[in-house]
Amino acid sequence: MKYLLYIILIAQFGACQNKKQNNMQETKFNWKPTFTSPKGYPVEVYSGGFADPYQSLHFGISTGSWGETGGSKGESTKIPRGLEVTWLAYAEDCFYRINCDIDSKKIEQLFNEGFKMRGASGKLNHEDYYYIIAGFAPGGVVVVWMAGAGKTTEVGRYQGKKIEIKEPPGLDSHERLYFDEIYRKGVMENEKIVPLEIQEANKNKPIPFGLWDSYRIKYLWKPTFVIQNEGKMNEDFGINFLNGEEINFRDNSFAERIDYKDDYNVKIEAGKQAVPSKIGFSWYDKLGQMYVGNIIFNDDEIFEVFTTLYKDNEDREAELELKVNMTNSFITVKLKGNGKEIAITKSKQKVFESRKKW
């Protein structure tokens, strides 16, 4: 009798374990595939996409910025485990191919965890990642990110190989364009794909291979917002980085570094993060009028400023000071650390009044 009871218990335990494993295997996450490339270096997927399960990345030519979502078709509920892609790099005028596993465990972890965003009331709300992005940079560099509302997180960096593809017979009129030299050159001269400003900036310059790996280096720094004339910082700002990542102050992992004890300025603890590419924030003047400031850094300048300050010690701490002038019309930016201050002067900025008031 005892032996029979033991057999029954073992069978029940095994059934529970199998059910648990099946539930784990059947976990579904809704997401969309998309791809990107650096501005000025458009690519087009010739064939393939995310693998196991397959999700195509054949969406036309990329025109967006590094790390940003692009075109997308379809939706999946299963975690991809690899990349099998052949793409045309127009700036290099060559094909690349990649066939590799990607960090599916990290993808699953990020899907399971999601991220917390603080609402206007201060309440933490759960948010989900909704896109998996594949980025293709010069030299066959491939980076994968996951993105949700106001949050982009890198999954991993991978490497493709340059290949040669001969034009196969029987292609339709569109497919033949991949092998048309005049068409490929025209893509690089198309201002809707490569803005004239970028065409002129890149003219007669070599392709900066390795640059997008350098953008992945993270430094210990923090943004500091200085609002003058009794103004007050609004609890609303976001940062995009050269490595394609994005954070928002409402992101709880970032909000935990913020101290609101100061009545007029937000104090933030330093954290390891890449060089910024954009910063947007808002504030109130002493009468309660709200202002918004958006800064787009010159990639070359901001990258050089950070590498200069950190060249002797990548572990030192620095602060990026954003100081609003007395009339709330302009923002000066400096990187400060190690007894040095380096002004950042080539950024584009827009400061304007908001309809919102205190």
Regions found by a protein language model. Give the residues of each.
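Structural motif
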Residues: 32-43, 225-233
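Sec-dependent signal peptide recognition
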Residues: 1-7
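Compositionally biased low-complexity segments at domain edges in trafficked proteins
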Residues: 110-178, 192-215, 305-358
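Edge beta-strands of extracellular beta-sandwich domains
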Residues: 95-101, 289-297
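C-terminal motif of bacterial Sec signal peptides marking the signal peptidase cleavage site
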Residues: 12-15
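Bacterial signal peptide processing site
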Residues: 17-19
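Tryptophan-paired
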Residues: 46-89, 237-293
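Long, low-hydrophobicity ectodomains and other hydrophilic envelope-associated domains
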Residues: 187-275
